[in-house]
Amino acid sequence: MKISRRKFFVKTLQGTALLAVTPALSTFLESCNTVTNPNSPQANLPRLSGTEANGTLTVNIDPNSALAKSGNAAIIGYSKGTLLVDHPSDTTYNVLSSICTHQQCSIDSFDSSSGEFICYCHGSRFDVNGAVRQGPAISPLAKYSSQFANNQLIIRI
């Protein structure tokens, strides 16, 4: 079977274009991956745990706790995942879902200078109340009610 010069040239260009696009396509598809590495170099939040009972999660905040000092933030693990906690003032704590509303990546970083939680999957940023400061996320993080008393943070889960 004989192939024309024109057909040969077209097929060669198509093959070359496919080879050129494949790495870019691979990078694009990988950027949409929803799994994150909790030990990524960007992860900077300390991880704490608490005790679950009757729809609440109780976290002891002793003087050595990562959340003892105002301005700090942490990740608190529990049976259904993790929560983000920010401590903006002496008795105030903000508790948010750690799941980014863009593509459900885990948020594990906090920029204390800007007061923002950062999702390194796609660059979304959220303030300490969960509002979107920078997309691509368009919805705020889910908020959990909490109260602080007797050195314990009690979160409704």
Write out the residue ranges for each language-model feature:
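N-terminal secretory signal peptides and thylakoid transit peptides that target proteins
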Residues: M1-P23, T27-N37
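Processing junctions and N-termini across compartments
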Residues: S26, N94, S113-G115
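Extracellular secreted precursors and ectodomains with disulfide-bonded cysteine-rich loops/domains
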Residues: E30, S98, Q103, F117-C119
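N-terminal pre-ligand scaffold of iron-sulfur
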Residues: V35-F110, K143-I157
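Iron-sulfur (Fe-S) cluster-binding segments and ferredoxin-like electron-carrier domains
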Residues: I107-S112, R125-A131
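Short cysteine/histidine-rich metal-coordination sites, predominantly Zn2+-binding motifs
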Residues: S114-H122, R133-A142
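Extracellular/periplasmic metallocenter environments
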Residues: Y120, R125, N129, I154
